[in-house]
């Protein structure tokens, strides 16, 4: 620590503290993370040493920059770049209910996906993706940090330890099933939902209720200001079956993210869209995601060969035939929205605007119906009819409409 001046303590956790420091000769700000080794189990000590070793080898523009590390007085000290914007949790609190623009949200999502794709391509599973581990620079770019729970996977390996933060844990981890890279995709989906909605994707008063919500993928509607494309991207990361979740590389190929991807640093050409218009339409209609692609290979210094970590996962196009059944009201809302959107999108750009408005209306109505707020539901739908209708009639009409669309969706799947 002789080369640094301590300015203040900026964080404290179960295993250590973080300090804002200034390098004496460079006069540049850094963060020193001190991880206590005294009174820790051998497993915790090993994790601290592993974090020090791992982060020194990571080289990505969207991962916190490593500066130095050492061991002193039963502590592991890790020096990384300082992000003036704080973390995403702090950003949400400071916004005071004002939602971020879709442009900003998409830019952050792309940067995080590039960081995760880099990690996965180098066999690193983060395992603790959450808003407090995502940092913002003064230029409003993201940096992924805190690799204390990260794991380096061997070829075809899966992880099995139950680690992480409960609200961001995927269903397979909670079910004590070995998990892989798709667990990070789930956690990122939780983060993006929270940044968009200013509330956790899954929240409950106790662990049993939380697990139940996660297993049912019981999500509240996202704010109406965001497009249906962005909402579908976030929800695709929160599919219960990991085989039906897209990889980071697949998400980066989505047409909706291309304008933001082009603005990123050190962009690999493999993420540029190359599918024909007909192929693009086919994939959009069935899954909302483009076909699989190989991710960019940027090896880190441990010199293990990069691999196509998700090659055994099924194509995300199977998501249209997903046999899992979440809560009925949630499923009906999603199915009806997607079916109507597809019909509108075949017509004109004006129809797309109407489709997005319709999606927001249906999500709101489904939420009110689920909560049995029939009076509010009546108020929402009253402008669409010439005569006043009772809340009971409104609820019956909405339920029948959603069920009819569901039947149509099932018929369409049977005919494919």
Curated annotation (Swiss-Prot):
CDD domains: STKc_Nek. Keywords: ATP-binding, Kinase, Nucleotide-binding, Serine/threonine-protein kinase, Transferase. It catalyses: L-seryl-[protein] + ATP = O-phospho-L-seryl-[protein] + ADP + H(+); L-threonyl-[protein] + ATP = O-phospho-L-threonyl-[protein] + ADP + H(+). InterPro entries: Kinase-like_dom_sf, NEK_Ser/Thr_kinase, Prot_kinase_dom, Protein_kinase_ATP_BS, Ser/Thr_kinase_AS. SUPFAM superfamilies: Protein kinase-like (PK-like) (SSF56112). It comes from the Eukaryota. SMART domains: S_TKc. The keyword Transferase applies. GO terms for biological process: cortical microtubule organization; lateral root formation; negative regulation of ethylene biosynthetic process; protein phosphorylation. Residues 4-257 form the Protein kinase domain. GO terms for molecular function: ATP binding; protein serine kinase activity; protein serine/threonine kinase activity. Residues 277-334 are annotated as: Disordered. It holds the Pfam family Pkinase. Its EC number is 2.7.11.34. Gene3D superfamilies: Phosphorylase Kinase, domain 1, Transferase(Phosphotransferase) domain 1. It is an enzyme of class 2 (transferase). ATP binds at residues 10-18, 33. Residues 302-328 have a biased composition (Basic and acidic residues). The active site is at 128 (proton acceptor). May be involved in plant development processes. This is Serine/threonine-protein kinase Nek6.
């Amino acid at each position: 620590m002789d080369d640094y001046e301590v300015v203040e303590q900026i964080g404290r956790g179960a295993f250590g503290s973080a300090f804002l420091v200034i390098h004496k000769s460079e006069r540049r700000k850094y963060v020193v993370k001190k991880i206590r080794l005294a009174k820790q189990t051998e497993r915790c000590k090993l994790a601290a040493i592993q974090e020090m070793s791992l982060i020194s080898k990571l080289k990505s523009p969207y991962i916190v920059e490593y500066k130095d590390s050492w061991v002193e007085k039963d502590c592991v000290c890790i020096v990384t770049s300082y992000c003036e914007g704080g973390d995403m949790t702090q950003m949400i609190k400071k916004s005071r209910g004002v939602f971020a623009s879709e442009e900003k949200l998409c830019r952050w999502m792309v940067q995080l996906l590039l960081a995760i794709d880099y990690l996965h391509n180098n066999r690193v599973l983060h395992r603790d993706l959450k808003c407090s581990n995502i940092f913002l620079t003064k230029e409003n770019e993201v940096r992924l940090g805190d690799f204390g729970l990260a794991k380096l996977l061997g070829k075809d390996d899966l992880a099995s330890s139950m680690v992480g933060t409960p609200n961001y844990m995927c269903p397979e981890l909670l079910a004590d099933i070995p998990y892989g890279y798709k667990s990070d995709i789930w956690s990122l989906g939780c983060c993006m939902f929270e940044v968009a909605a200013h509330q956790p994707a899954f929240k409950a008063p106790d662990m049993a209720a939380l697990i139940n919500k996660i297993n049912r993928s019981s999500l509240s509607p996202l704010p109406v200001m965001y497009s249906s494309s962005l909402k579908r991207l976030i929800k695709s990361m929160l599919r219960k079956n990991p085989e039906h979740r897209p990889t980071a590389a697949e998400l980066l190929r989505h047409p909706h993210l291309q304008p933001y991807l082009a603005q990123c640093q050190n962009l690999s050409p493999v993420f540029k869209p190359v599918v024909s218009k007909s192929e693009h339409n086919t994939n959009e209609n069935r899954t909302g995601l483009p076909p699989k692609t190989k991710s960019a290979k940027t090896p880190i210094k441990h010199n293990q060969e990069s691999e196509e970590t998700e090659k055994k996962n099924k194509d995300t196009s199977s998501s249209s035939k997903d046999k899992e059944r979440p809560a009925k009201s949630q499923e009906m809302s999603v199915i009806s929205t997607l079916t109507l959107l597809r019909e509108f999108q075949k017509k004109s750009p004006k129809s797309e605007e109407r489709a997005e408005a319709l999606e927001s209306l249906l999500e709101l109505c489904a939420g009110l119906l689920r909560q049995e707020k029939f009076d509010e539901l009546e108020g929402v739908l009253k402008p669409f009819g010439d005569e006043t209708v009772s809340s009971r009639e409104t609820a019956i009409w909405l339920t029948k409409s959603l069920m009819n669309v569901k039947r149509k969706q099932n018929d369409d799947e049977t005919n494919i």
